[in-house]
Amino acid sequence: MDNNMKGKTLVISGGTKGIGKECVYKFAKNGVNVAFTYNSNQQFAEDICKDVEDKFGVKCKAYPFNILEPEKYKELFEEIDKDFDRVDFFISNAMIYGRAVVGGYGKFMKLKPRGLNNIYTATVNAFVCGAQQAAKRMQKIGGGAIVSLSSTGNLVYIENYAGHGTNKAAVEAMVKYAANELGEFG
Protein backbone atom coordinates (compact mmCIF):
# COMPACT_ATOMS: atom_id res chain seq x y z
CA MET A 1 0.00 0.00 0.00
CA ASP A 2 1.21 3.52 -0.84
CA ASN A 3 0.66 5.58 2.32
CA ASN A 4 0.77 8.80 0.27
CA MET A 5 -2.45 7.70 -1.43
CA LYS A 6 -4.33 6.30 1.56
CA GLY A 7 -7.62 8.09 2.22
CA LYS A 8 -7.67 9.91 -1.11
CA THR A 9 -10.51 9.49 -3.61
CA LEU A 10 -10.56 8.40 -7.25
CA VAL A 11 -13.45 9.17 -9.60
CA ILE A 12 -13.33 7.08 -12.78
CA SER A 13 -15.83 6.74 -15.59
CA GLY A 14 -16.41 3.17 -16.71
CA GLY A 15 -15.21 1.07 -13.80
CA THR A 16 -16.78 -2.32 -14.50
CA LYS A 17 -14.62 -3.65 -17.36
CA GLY A 18 -11.11 -3.72 -18.73
CA ILE A 19 -8.70 -0.93 -17.85
CA GLY A 20 -11.32 0.90 -15.79
CA LYS A 21 -11.94 -2.09 -13.56
CA GLU A 22 -8.19 -2.64 -13.16
CA CYS A 23 -7.81 1.01 -12.11
CA VAL A 24 -10.57 0.58 -9.51
CA TYR A 25 -8.73 -2.38 -7.98
CA LYS A 26 -5.22 -0.90 -8.23
CA PHE A 27 -6.20 2.39 -6.57
CA ALA A 28 -8.22 0.58 -3.89
CA LYS A 29 -5.27 -1.71 -3.17
CA ASN A 30 -3.29 1.47 -2.43
CA GLY A 31 -5.87 2.69 0.09
CA VAL A 32 -7.77 5.01 -2.24
CA ASN A 33 -11.55 5.32 -1.95
CA VAL A 34 -13.25 4.80 -5.30
CA ALA A 35 -16.29 6.29 -7.04
CA PHE A 36 -16.91 4.84 -10.48
CA THR A 37 -19.59 4.95 -13.13
CA TYR A 38 -21.28 2.10 -14.94
CA ASN A 39 -23.58 2.05 -17.92
CA SER A 40 -26.18 -0.63 -17.33
CA ASN A 41 -25.41 -3.50 -14.96
CA GLN A 42 -26.10 -2.20 -11.45
CA GLN A 43 -25.72 -5.58 -9.74
CA PHE A 44 -22.33 -6.19 -11.35
CA ALA A 45 -21.16 -2.71 -10.29
CA GLU A 46 -22.38 -3.27 -6.74
CA ASP A 47 -20.59 -6.64 -6.64
CA ILE A 48 -17.34 -4.93 -7.62
CA CYS A 49 -17.82 -2.37 -4.83
CA LYS A 50 -18.48 -5.05 -2.25
CA ASP A 51 -15.42 -7.00 -3.37
CA VAL A 52 -13.22 -3.88 -3.27
CA GLU A 53 -14.48 -2.88 0.18
CA ASP A 54 -14.03 -6.40 1.56
CA LYS A 55 -10.53 -6.87 0.11
CA PHE A 56 -9.04 -3.44 0.72
CA GLY A 57 -11.10 -1.75 3.45
CA VAL A 58 -11.81 1.36 1.40
CA LYS A 59 -15.07 3.04 0.51
CA CYS A 60 -16.41 2.23 -2.95
CA LYS A 61 -19.57 3.45 -4.65
CA ALA A 62 -20.89 2.93 -8.18
CA TYR A 63 -23.09 5.43 -10.01
CA PRO A 64 -25.18 4.91 -13.14
CA PHE A 65 -24.06 7.24 -15.92
CA ASN A 66 -24.60 7.56 -19.66
CA ILE A 67 -21.34 8.79 -21.17
CA LEU A 68 -23.33 10.16 -24.12
CA GLU A 69 -24.80 12.73 -21.70
CA PRO A 70 -21.60 14.35 -20.38
CA GLU A 71 -23.45 17.51 -19.37
CA LYS A 72 -24.82 15.41 -16.49
CA TYR A 73 -21.37 15.21 -14.90
CA LYS A 74 -22.39 18.18 -12.73
CA GLU A 75 -25.21 16.17 -11.14
CA LEU A 76 -22.98 13.09 -10.89
CA PHE A 77 -20.32 15.00 -8.97
CA GLU A 78 -22.97 16.48 -6.69
CA GLU A 79 -23.96 12.90 -5.81
CA ILE A 80 -20.32 11.95 -5.30
CA ASP A 81 -19.93 14.97 -2.99
CA LYS A 82 -22.62 13.49 -0.74
CA ASP A 83 -20.71 10.21 -0.42
CA PHE A 84 -17.06 11.34 -0.43
CA ASP A 85 -15.37 14.33 1.18
CA ARG A 86 -12.77 14.92 -1.54
CA VAL A 87 -11.75 14.17 -5.13
CA ASP A 88 -8.02 13.65 -5.72
CA PHE A 89 -7.94 11.72 -8.98
CA PHE A 90 -10.19 11.73 -12.06
CA ILE A 91 -9.79 9.24 -14.89
CA SER A 92 -11.87 9.71 -18.02
CA ASN A 93 -12.09 6.12 -19.19
CA ALA A 94 -15.62 5.17 -20.31
CA MET A 95 -16.18 4.55 -24.00
CA ILE A 96 -19.15 3.66 -26.12
CA TYR A 97 -19.69 0.51 -28.11
CA GLY A 98 -22.45 -1.25 -30.01
CA ARG A 99 -25.12 0.73 -31.86
CA ALA A 100 -23.82 4.07 -30.59
CA VAL A 101 -20.67 3.76 -32.71
CA VAL A 102 -22.40 2.72 -35.94
CA GLY A 103 -20.98 5.09 -38.54
CA GLY A 104 -18.00 5.97 -36.37
CA TYR A 105 -16.13 2.71 -36.55
CA GLY A 106 -15.22 1.34 -39.94
CA LYS A 107 -13.61 2.25 -43.22
CA PHE A 108 -13.16 5.97 -43.94
CA MET A 109 -15.74 5.96 -46.76
CA LYS A 110 -18.34 4.42 -44.44
CA LEU A 111 -18.02 7.01 -41.62
CA LYS A 112 -21.20 8.91 -40.72
CA PRO A 113 -21.66 12.13 -38.72
CA ARG A 114 -23.84 10.52 -36.05
CA GLY A 115 -21.31 7.82 -35.16
CA LEU A 116 -18.43 10.31 -35.25
CA ASN A 117 -20.37 12.75 -33.08
CA ASN A 118 -21.18 10.03 -30.55
CA ILE A 119 -17.52 9.09 -30.27
CA TYR A 120 -16.58 12.78 -29.88
CA THR A 121 -19.20 13.19 -27.17
CA ALA A 122 -17.96 10.10 -25.30
CA THR A 123 -14.30 11.11 -25.52
CA VAL A 124 -13.75 14.86 -25.82
CA ASN A 125 -16.96 16.27 -24.36
CA ALA A 126 -16.99 13.70 -21.57
CA PHE A 127 -13.38 14.51 -20.67
CA VAL A 128 -14.09 18.26 -20.62
CA CYS A 129 -17.24 18.03 -18.51
CA GLY A 130 -15.82 15.47 -16.09
CA ALA A 131 -12.43 17.16 -15.74
CA GLN A 132 -14.05 20.55 -15.10
CA GLN A 133 -16.10 19.14 -12.24
CA ALA A 134 -13.13 17.24 -10.82
CA ALA A 135 -10.81 20.26 -11.09
CA LYS A 136 -13.23 22.43 -9.10
CA ARG A 137 -13.02 19.95 -6.24
CA MET A 138 -9.27 19.43 -6.55
CA GLN A 139 -8.64 23.16 -6.30
CA LYS A 140 -10.30 23.11 -2.87
CA ILE A 141 -7.83 20.50 -1.56
CA GLY A 142 -4.69 21.89 -3.16
CA GLY A 143 -4.49 19.84 -6.34
CA GLY A 144 -4.93 16.41 -7.82
CA ALA A 145 -4.45 14.42 -11.01
CA ILE A 146 -6.64 14.25 -14.13
CA VAL A 147 -6.11 11.55 -16.76
CA SER A 148 -7.84 10.64 -20.01
CA LEU A 149 -7.16 7.21 -21.44
CA SER A 150 -6.38 7.06 -25.13
CA SER A 151 -4.86 4.68 -27.66
CA THR A 152 -2.17 4.50 -30.29
CA GLY A 153 -4.88 4.74 -32.94
CA ASN A 154 -4.31 8.48 -33.14
CA LEU A 155 -0.62 7.96 -33.96
CA VAL A 156 -0.58 5.05 -36.37
CA TYR A 157 -3.00 3.63 -38.89
CA ILE A 158 -5.29 0.94 -37.51
CA GLU A 159 -7.78 -0.54 -39.93
CA ASN A 160 -11.38 0.65 -39.35
CA TYR A 161 -10.22 3.06 -36.61
CA ALA A 162 -10.45 6.47 -38.34
CA GLY A 163 -13.43 7.59 -36.26
CA HIS A 164 -11.90 6.55 -32.95
CA GLY A 165 -8.34 7.55 -33.82
CA THR A 166 -9.22 11.11 -34.78
CA ASN A 167 -11.31 11.54 -31.65
CA LYS A 168 -8.49 10.18 -29.49
CA ALA A 169 -6.20 12.78 -31.09
CA ALA A 170 -8.77 15.46 -30.25
CA VAL A 171 -9.05 14.42 -26.60
CA GLU A 172 -5.27 14.31 -26.27
CA ALA A 173 -5.09 17.89 -27.56
CA MET A 174 -7.79 18.89 -25.07
CA VAL A 175 -5.84 17.24 -22.23
CA LYS A 176 -2.81 19.39 -23.13
CA TYR A 177 -4.91 22.56 -22.97
CA ALA A 178 -6.40 21.51 -19.64
CA ALA A 179 -2.94 20.72 -18.24
CA ASN A 180 -1.60 24.12 -19.25
CA GLU A 181 -4.52 25.97 -17.70
CA LEU A 182 -4.94 23.85 -14.57
CA GLY A 183 -1.29 23.03 -13.86
CA GLU A 184 -0.77 26.06 -11.64
CA PHE A 185 -3.35 24.66 -9.20
CA GLY A 186 -1.40 21.48 -8.54
Where are these regions (language model features)?
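A short, exposed helix-loop element centered on a Lys and neighboring polar residues
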Residues: 131-132, 176
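Conserved mid-core segment of classical short-chain dehydrogenase/reductases
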Residues: 74, 96-117, 136, 160-163
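Alpha-helical segment proximal to the catalytic Tyr-Lys
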Residues: 136, 180-181
